[in-house]
A protein has these predicted regions:
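Acidic, PIN/NYN-like endoribonuclease modules and their adjacent C-terminal/linker elements
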Residues: 1-3, 39, 112, 117-160
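Short, well-structured N-terminal submotif of metal-dependent ribonuclease cores
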Residues: 1-42, 52-64, 153-160
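A general structural signal for well-ordered alpha-helical segments in protein cores
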Residues: 22, 43, 66, 88, ...
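Short, mixed-charge aromatic SLiMs
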Residues: 33-37, 67-76, 134-143
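Conserved phosphoryl-transfer catalytic core
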Residues: 46
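Helix-adjacent hinge/juxtasegments
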Residues: 52-85
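Active-site neighborhoods of divalent-metal-dependent phosphate/nucleic-acid chemistry enzymes
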Residues: 76-133
Length: 160
């Protein structure tokens, strides 16, 4: 199975049936059958975003799917070497290299820095995101990148 670093936008779309990118991400998962990198920052960000959607049955289903995946380690591969302090330092370094040329938020830099670090340590097959700016950053650092894009103008995702 390929190992994919999917940022929280892609993982949210994988878990939440009403996310605008859900169909695209689900099709990619069916086609590639990847395992996903999972670490403390990604876990926090994904759980936080899913908690905010637990206001209806789709949000609850997404939350339960996440919890089941975490308990069984189905698809989510924990990466203990990605520690928050080390990844914050790596994101700081990456920001210093690229912030003037690639306009991304700090969380985007953290995801790309973590993916880049893991790629150097053991290799990842791809970086997945629904965020065009983050995809540009990942590509600029040499990561093989898949950007999920809608054919129509984007609306609001279930995550907000």
């Amino acid at each position: 199975m390929p190992l994919v670093y999917a940022d929280s936008s892609a993982l949210f779309a994988y878990l939440h049936p009403r996310d605008e990118f859900s169909t695209l991400v689900d099709a990619a998962v069916r086609e590639d059958s990847p395992d996903f990198v999972y670490w403390s920052w990604l876990r926090f960000e994904l759980r936080h975003n899913l908690r905010m959607t637990r206001t209806d049955s789709d949000g609850e289903v997404a939350w339960q799917a996440l919890r089941a995946a975490e308990k069984t380690a189905a698809r989510f591969r924990w990466q203990g070497e990605l520690t928050a302090d080390k990844m914050l330092d790596a994101a700081e370094e990456l920001s210093g290299e690229r912030a003037r040329t690639i306009d991304c938020g700090s969380g985007d830099y953290l995801h790309v820095a973590a993916a880049r670090r893991l790629n150097l340590l053991s290799g990842i097959d791809e970086f997945w995101t629904c965020d065009a700016a983050q995809a540009a950053l990942a590509s600029a650092t040499g990561l093989p990148t898949r950007l999920f894009q809608l054919k129509h103008a984007p609306g609001k995702t279930a995550a907000g």
